[in-house]
């Protein structure tokens, strides 16, 4: 059976690094307060002339180089983002053009912080169905553009960046020993839409708006739902948490990550962590973490990975894949 295996990874982080201390003369906060509650120490902000597509193109180029492929060998581009350059056309078509591609298809996918997990499931389905042999997946965000800089409960959390993964079709035996994506689990529940949202939009206010969040409630849902979705995906793959080599979580908050790992009975030594250096980069966080860990040589062939995320909607999900 056809499997979607990881051929390459790449990422890009803007040059501007913002330490927690930057917020101290703007808000009633401190480096110690932010670290204690989130685990975040710094984050990157895009330059004024950088758009989400610019970040995505640079991450895509890095992933293609890691895969040893040219853009002409890619069949589809999927970009997960909540901060597009424009209402339309899609960021994906801008990346497609930026890479010099004149073929294939490209589209955006919006599931906020869960976006890259949804994108992985989309790409897996395309490859399994024979609609594409190679898919370039990108998570790219410029959340600094939608921050309310007077709200210390949100503006200290987020950063900008992009990560990319090249998935490629390969033949497997149809067993849990195969390389590639083995199972996915996607969920959403719109009754919780007011827990995490942006208070602007084309059809409502005609403005970009600012991010709003009921942090305590989001935290509770995240701790419950992330471990549950990971367990469901593992069960679908015929696997158990004790077989997991690496948990690659959405990098929202260290306390959420620790609680999820505890519920899965995984030691923190098996968890990929980038939240301290990147902050919450929404849909970019999982591909950023994958790329950083891959560049460090942490993943070995045959390693079993679980990626999970939750975001506005609420939308959440997980992917089980073998490296």
Curated annotation (Swiss-Prot):
Annotated Pfam families: ACP_syn_III, ACP_syn_III_C
Catalytic activity field: malonyl-[ACP] + acetyl-CoA + H(+) = 3-oxobutanoyl-[ACP] + CO2 + CoA
Compartment list: Cytoplasm
Assigned EC number: 2.3.1.180
SUPFAM superfamilies: Thiolase-like (SSF53901)
Gene Ontology MF term list: 3-oxoacyl-[acyl-carrier-protein] synthase activity; beta-ketoacyl-acyl-carrier-protein synthase III activity
Top-level lineage group: Bacteria
Main localization category: cytoplasm
This protein's GO CC annotations: cytoplasm
Gene Ontology biological process terms in this record: fatty acid biosynthetic process; secondary metabolite biosynthetic process
Pathways per UniProt: Lipid metabolism; fatty acid biosynthesis
Keyword terms: Acyltransferase, Cytoplasm, Fatty acid biosynthesis, Fatty acid metabolism, Lipid biosynthesis, Lipid metabolism, Multifunctional enzyme, Transferase
Gene3D superfamilies: 3.40.47.10
Enzyme active site: 113, 250, 280
Chain residue ranges for the region called ACP-binding: 251-255
Domain notes: The last Arg residue of the ACP-binding site is essential for the weak association between ACP/AcpP and FabH.
PANTHER family registered for this protein in UniProt: 3-OXOACYL-[ACYL-CARRIER-PROTEIN] SYNTHASE 3, BETA-KETOACYL-[ACYL-CARRIER-PROTEIN] SYNTHASE III
Family per similarity comment: Belongs to the thiolase-like superfamily. FabH family.
NCBIfam families: fabH, PRK09352.1
Function: Catalyzes the condensation reaction of fatty acid synthesis by the addition to an acyl acceptor of two carbons from malonyl-ACP. Catalyzes the first condensation reaction which initiates fatty acid synthesis and may therefore play a role in governing the total rate of fatty acid production. Possesses both acetoacetyl-ACP synthase and acetyl transacylase activities. Its substrate specificity determines the biosynthesis of branched-chain and/or straight-chain of fatty acids.
Name listed for the protein in its UniProt record: Beta-ketoacyl-[acyl-carrier-protein] synthase III
Naturally occurring in which organism (per UniProt): Paracoccus denitrificans (strain Pd 1222)
């Amino acid at each position: 059976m056809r499997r979607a295996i990881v051929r390459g990874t790449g990422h890009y982080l803007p040059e501007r690094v913002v330490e927690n201390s930057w917020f101290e003369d703007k808000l009633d906060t401190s480096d110690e307060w932010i670290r204690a509650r989130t685990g975040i120490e710094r984050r990157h902000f895009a330059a004024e002339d950088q758009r989400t597509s610019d970040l995505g193109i640079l991450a895509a180029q890095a992933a293609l180089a890691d895969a040893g492929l040219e853009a002409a060998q890619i069949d589809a581009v999927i970009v997960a983002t909540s901060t597009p350059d424009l209402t339309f056309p899609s960021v994906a078509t801008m990346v497609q053009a930026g890479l010099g591609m004149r073929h294939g298809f490209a589209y955006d996918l919006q599931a906020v912080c869960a976006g890259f997990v949804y994108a992985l499931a989309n790409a897996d389905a395309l490859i399994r169905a024979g609609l594409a042999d190679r898919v370039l997946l990108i998570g790219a965000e410029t959340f600094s553009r939608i921050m309310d800089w007077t709200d210390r409960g949100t503006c200290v959390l987020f950063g900008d960046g992009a990560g990319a993964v090249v998935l490629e079709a390969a033949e497997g035996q149809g067993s849990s020993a195969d390389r590639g994506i083995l199972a996915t689990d996607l969920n959403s529940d719109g009754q919780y839409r007011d827990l995490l949202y942006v208070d602007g939009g084309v059809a409502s206010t005609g403005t970009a708006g600012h991010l709003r969040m009921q942090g305590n409630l989001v935290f509770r849902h995240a701790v419950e739902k992330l471990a549950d979705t990971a367990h469901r995906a593992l069960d679908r793959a015929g696997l158990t948490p004790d077989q997991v080599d690496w948990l690659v979580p959405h990098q929202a908050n260290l306390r959420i990550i620790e609680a999820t790992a505890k519920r899965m009975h995984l030691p923190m030594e098996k968890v990929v962590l980038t939240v301290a250096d990147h902050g919450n980069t929404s849909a970019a966080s999982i591909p950023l973490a994958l790329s950083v860990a891959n560049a460090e040589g942490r993943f070995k062939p045959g390693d079993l990975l679980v990626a999970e995320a939750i975001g506005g909607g609420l939308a959440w999900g997980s992917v089980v894949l073998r490296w």
